[in-house]
From Swiss-Prot:
Record-level GO cellular component terms: extracellular region
Oligomeric and partner information: Monomer. Interacts with and forms tight 1:1 complexes with RNH1. Dimerization of two such complexes may occur. Interaction with RNH1 inhibits this protein.
Highest classification ranks of the organism: Eukaryota, Metazoa, Chordata, Craniata, Vertebrata
Annotated catalytic residues: H12, H119
Primary enzyme class: lyase
Keywords assigned: Disulfide bond, Endonuclease, Hydrolase, Lyase, Nuclease, Secreted
UniProt biased composition (Basic and acidic residues): 1-13
SUPFAM superfamilies (UniProt xref): RNase A-like (SSF54076)
One function term, GO molecular function aspect: ribonuclease A activity
Predominant localisation class: secreted
Name recorded for this polypeptide: Ribonuclease pancreatic
Length: 124
């Protein structure tokens, strides 16, 4: 079974792309990263930074998670991200997404040993 840390990497990490160059980016990535298999995942964020930089966030600013848990962390610096949002004409299995690029501080939930990101909580 896929670990929570591996799932985070599959769903949110894309260090090899500096930013989403085309509107097709989300459609291709959401499909290739298997987030459109049994439904269209409505919203997903990809982070265009190194895995080491994202893992380091687990040791940065401790903040409350949206669900009230205390194991979330906000990055000290802004990171290149792409938000993929399902667009109005999307209809499973033909999932259609709109890409929005931003440079924002990310918030991730971390757990385990080693202490690594397991959930993307948001960006500010």
């Amino acid at each position: 079974k896929e670990s929570a840390a591996a799932k985070f990497e599959r769903q949110h990490m894309d260090p090899s792309t500096s930013s989403a160059s085309s509107s097709d980016y989300c459609n291709q990535m959401m499909q290739s990263r298997k987030m459109t298999q049994d439904r269209c995942k409505p919203v997903n964020t990809f982070v265009h930074e190194s895995l080491a930089d994202v893992q380091a966030v687990c040791f940065q600013k401790n903040v409350a998670c949206k669900n009230g848990q205390s194991n979330c962390y906000q990055s000290n610096s802004a990171m290149h991200i792409t938000d993929c949002r399902e667009s109005g004409n999307s209809n499973y299995p033909n999932c259609v997404y709109k890409a929005t690029q931003a440079e924002k501080h990310i918030i991730v939930a971390c757990e385990g040993n080693p202490y690594v990101p397991v959930h993307f909580d948001g960006s500010v």
